[in-house]
Amino acid sequence: MYDSDEADAWKRAVDLGIEREHRAQPVVLDPVGAFECKLTFFFRRPKSHYGKGGHVKASAPVCHVSKPDADNLAKLVLDRITRGGRIWRDDSQVAKLHVEKYWAITDARIGVYVSVQRFEGSEA
């Protein structure tokens, strides 16, 4: 993701979310363990996705397939989690990563939903 006003807004939102979640459910830093992380991004739909009455058109896409790229979004979030220093020492500890991008159904859903858990993977 480019260092733009939009990227800065995402960074602030991620930082606030990390702080809020940590207050609600404190986590102990694990400096060596492996983690699994799922990131689900929801973006505001453009006006062209809406028809009469403000309803989403049946032809409007579900998946967000334009910029920013999924890998850049993931890097931003993982770097912010690392910067927060509350879960892992370094985002290289993320052994499994799943990223999804969608258009939000409502503006209330816009943002990123993050799920992190310890990864007890097996050899492939």
Language-model segments: which ranges?
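Acidic, proline/glycine-enriched N-terminal capping motif
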Residues: 1-124
